[in-house]
């Protein structure tokens, strides 16, 4: 079984000179889920949406082409794709000739689907930037914080008040790569219906990820599971939009199956 320590993270590697799908490094999701007590049926649906900013290949005549792309990896795939391996794989296309852009899209989708173990959707282009911002930020709350990890779900609670439906946001989520220790920065959005979630407790909880080492996808699943367990909303959506690194950013989303309408798809201003 592949582990994060087996990947190219934190290692000096030569950039590929030709197309090489074996560069893609899948990591089974099961281990990360076991760490947060998810061993049976998943309490969520969702996907990991990647934005690729540095995509290039050669056309049939050898002329370089450039593009951006959006990749959708379903969260029920057996494996996630490690980010550095995805960067190296996409770079392996740089000197490869394709007869059409559609051939490139199909090749990427096929290779990612094979490694993830489920159908991965690939489309050219990127979502628009969310210049307005959905929901209400909790970042201006005036409170003292001195707990930066590990994530502490005990901060989470809901008030015994009538049910609300609201969207809460924070730009203060930070976690760290479990292999290299590099910081991962994100804006996080929680949309839910249920008893009002205590906002101070939610902010303290999110800040308690600051020294925590875990992959992006696992952080979002931990947040979803902790909020669901501690606050018992009728339904819940959690999305984190991580900042770009190596020409890629990742946006994991986990949602209750009963959500009436999905979140709009946007990029964050920091991406």
Curated annotation (Swiss-Prot):
<dbReference type="GO" id="GO:0008616">
    <property type="term" value="P:queuosine biosynthetic process"/>
</dbReference>
<keyword id="KW-0963">Cytoplasm</keyword>
<dbReference type="Pfam" id="PF14819">
    <property type="entry name" value="QueF_N"/>
</dbReference>
<comment type="function">
    <text>Catalyzes the NADPH-dependent reduction of 7-cyano-7-deazaguanine (preQ0) to 7-aminomethyl-7-deazaguanine (preQ1).</text>
</comment>
<feature type="binding site">
    <location>
        <begin position="216"/>
        <end position="217"/>
    </location>
    <ligand>
        <name>substrate</name>
    </ligand>
</feature>
<dbReference type="GO" id="GO:0005737">
    <property type="term" value="C:cytoplasm"/>
</dbReference>
<comment type="similarity">
    <text>Belongs to the GTP cyclohydrolase I family. QueF type 2 subfamily.</text>
</comment>
<protein>
    <recommendedName>
        <fullName>NADPH-dependent 7-cyano-7-deazaguanine reductase</fullName>
        <ecNumber>1.7.1.13</ecNumber>
    </recommendedName>
</protein>
<keyword id="KW-0560">Oxidoreductase</keyword>
<keyword id="KW-0521">NADP</keyword>
<feature type="binding site">
    <location>
        <begin position="245"/>
        <end position="246"/>
    </location>
    <ligand>
        <name>NADPH</name>
    </ligand>
</feature>
<feature type="active site" description="Proton donor">
    <location>
        <position position="184"/>
    </location>
</feature>
<dbReference type="InterPro" id="IPR043133">
    <property type="entry name" value="GTP-CH-I_C/QueF"/>
</dbReference>
<dbReference type="InterPro" id="IPR016428">
    <property type="entry name" value="QueF_type2"/>
</dbReference>
<dbReference type="InterPro" id="IPR029500">
    <property type="entry name" value="QueF"/>
</dbReference>
<dbReference type="GO" id="GO:0033739">
    <property type="term" value="F:preQ1 synthase activity"/>
</dbReference>
<feature type="binding site">
    <location>
        <begin position="83"/>
        <end position="84"/>
    </location>
    <ligand>
        <name>NADPH</name>
    </ligand>
</feature>
<dbReference type="Pfam" id="PF14489">
    <property type="entry name" value="QueF"/>
</dbReference>
<feature type="active site" description="Thioimide intermediate">
    <location>
        <position position="177"/>
    </location>
</feature>
<dbReference type="GO" id="GO:0006400">
    <property type="term" value="P:tRNA modification"/>
</dbReference>
<feature type="binding site">
    <location>
        <begin position="81"/>
        <end position="83"/>
    </location>
    <ligand>
        <name>substrate</name>
    </ligand>
</feature>
<comment type="subunit">
    <text>Homodimer.</text>
</comment>
<dbReference type="InterPro" id="IPR050084">
    <property type="entry name" value="NADPH_dep_7-cyano-7-deazaG_red"/>
</dbReference>
<keyword id="KW-0671">Queuosine biosynthesis</keyword>
<dbReference type="InterPro" id="IPR029139">
    <property type="entry name" value="QueF_N"/>
</dbReference>
<comment type="pathway">
    <text>tRNA modification; tRNA-queuosine biosynthesis.</text>
</comment>
């Amino acid at each position: 079984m592949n582990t994060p320590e087996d990947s190219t993270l934190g290692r000096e590697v030569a950039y590929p000179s030709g197309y090489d799908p074996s560069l893609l490094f899948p990591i089974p999701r099961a281990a990360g889920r076991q760490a947060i007590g998810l061993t049976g049926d998943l309490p969520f649906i969702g996907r990991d949406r990647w934005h690729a900013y540095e995509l290039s290949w050669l056309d049939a005549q050898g002329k370089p082409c450039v593009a951006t792309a959006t990749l959708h990896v379903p969260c029920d795939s057996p494996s996630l794709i490690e980010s550095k391996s995805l960067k190296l794989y996409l770079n392996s296309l740089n000197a490869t000739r394709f007869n059409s852009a559609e051939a490139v899209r199909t090749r990427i989708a096929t290779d990612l689907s094979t490694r993830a173990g489920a159908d991965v959707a690939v489309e050219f282009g990127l979502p628009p930037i969310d210049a307005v911002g959905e929901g209400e930020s909790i970042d201006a709350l005036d409170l003292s914080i001195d707990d930066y990890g590990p994530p502490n779900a005990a901060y989470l609670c809901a008030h015994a008040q009538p049910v609300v439906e609201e969207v809460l946001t924070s730009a203060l989520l930070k976690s760290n790569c479990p292999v290299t220790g590099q910081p991962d920065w994100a804006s996080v959005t929680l949309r839910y219906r249920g008893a009002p979630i205590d906002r101070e407790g939610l902010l303290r909880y999110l800040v308690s990820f600051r020294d925590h080492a875990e992959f992006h996808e696992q952080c979002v699943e931990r947040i979803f599971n902790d909020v669901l367990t501690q606050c018992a909303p009728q339904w819940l959506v959690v999305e984190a939009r991580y900042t770009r690194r190596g020409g890629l950013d990742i946006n994991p989303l986990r949602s209750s199956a009963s959500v009436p309408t999905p979140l709009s798809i946007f990029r964050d201003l920091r991406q």
